[in-house]
């Protein structure tokens, strides 16, 4: 049975690809799930599906509602949530996803650079692990699934 990991958060770098590559290299039985990572589609889905909205608020609100269907379902089905916080943008959605995971009792791993430690101290305190690199996430998955530490290369 595959282990399902929801990759939440920052969409402007290749961290998801790095995790997927590491999982393939180690032949781990892991299914990766993500939110819509095409920013334009994520922002426009509400208006594109439900029609033009009268204000920017409702444009964003209808898109957020539709995206939440995917996000909530994916989080509820996941064995682990990995939330990446990047330095360039404030990822309020990522913090919200982390909170949903914790509230649902789903294991949480955060992934961010050291300079965000203070800003994310409460989120990190709720996480089972705080990673600095996608490779550390893959190492956690390898250990959790095998129950063994792999020798360092």
Predicted regions: what they are:
Residues 1-153:
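Conserved catalytic or regulatory cores that recognize and/or transform ribose-phosphate-containing ligands
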